[in-house]
Design a protein with these regions (language model features):
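Acyl-donor-binding surface of acyltransferase catalytic domains
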Residues: 1-66
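Active-site rim helix/loop that mediates acceptor-substrate recognition in acyltransferases
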Residues: 59-82
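Conserved acyl-donor/pantetheine-binding loop and adjacent beta-alpha core of acyl/acetyltransferases
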Residues: 72-73, 80-115
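Short coil/turn motifs at secondary-structure junctions
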Residues: 94-96, 124, 154
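Conserved acetyl-CoA-binding loop-helix of GNAT-fold acetyltransferases
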Residues: 118-141, 160-164
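Conserved GNAT acetyl-CoA-binding A-motif
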Residues: 142-154
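Conserved active-site alpha-helix within GNAT-family acetyltransferase domains
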Residues: 153-173
């Protein structure tokens, strides 16, 4: 009974949260590769089957089992160091015209663009430039492609990392 009550409360909070949160949308088109001093590489996972085979990712998806559904339209991208997942996120790889930003339940036009979303940096690697690094590596991989990324307006570290990676502010979004 308590679990149902907690779940119901979470749904109510999530519903009202959509009305107060403000999102910022950034865009970037890179023509030339950016130089990076650190030898790093991003890894792309294209399917659930591929993720399940990867021993390194098992714990991530064990804790985030609902994210397996994203493989229908997206690729999982990550940066690793030894056996640690440093930073990760998703790239929508399906050719679709609109994208729903779940936090505010609002659709945006992404025709001929790739959307980057749900990025996360491991707590022990935060504030060390890894989020900026993974975004630059993604830009280098997708040269001459329009890339979009969004974050909450009050997530100052993310806004700083996104702009440091070369993304330009496009506009802010709210539910209404």
């Amino acid at each position: 009974m308590q679990l149902i009550k907690d779940n119901y409360i979470k749904k109510i909070i999530k519903y009202f949260y959509k009305f107060i949160v403000k999102m910022l949308l950034f865009e970037c088109v890179i023509v030339n590769k950016k130089k990076i001093r650190i030898k790093s590489k991003i890894y792309l996972v294209n399917s659930q089957k591929e993720a399940e085979k990867n021993i390194f990712l098992k714990s991530y998806f064990k804790n985030n089992i609902e994210k397996y559904d994203r493989f229908k339209s997206s690729k999982f991208v990550f940066l690793k160091k030894n056996n640690d997942l440093i930073a990760s996120g998703w790239i929508c790889s399906k050719k679709i015209a609109t994208w729903n930003i779940e936090e505010i339940d609002k659709k945006i036009n992404i025709k001929n663009k790739k959307i980057l979303y749900d990025f996360e940096t491991n707590k022990k690697y935060r504030n060390k430039g890894y989020y900026t690094l993974i975004l630059i590596l993604i830009q280098n991989k997708y040269l001459k492609k329009n890339l979009l990324i969004y974050t909450q307006a009050d997530n100052y570290p993310a806004v700083k990392a996104i702009t440091n990676a070369g993304f330009k502010f496009k506009y802010s979004l709210k539910k209404f």
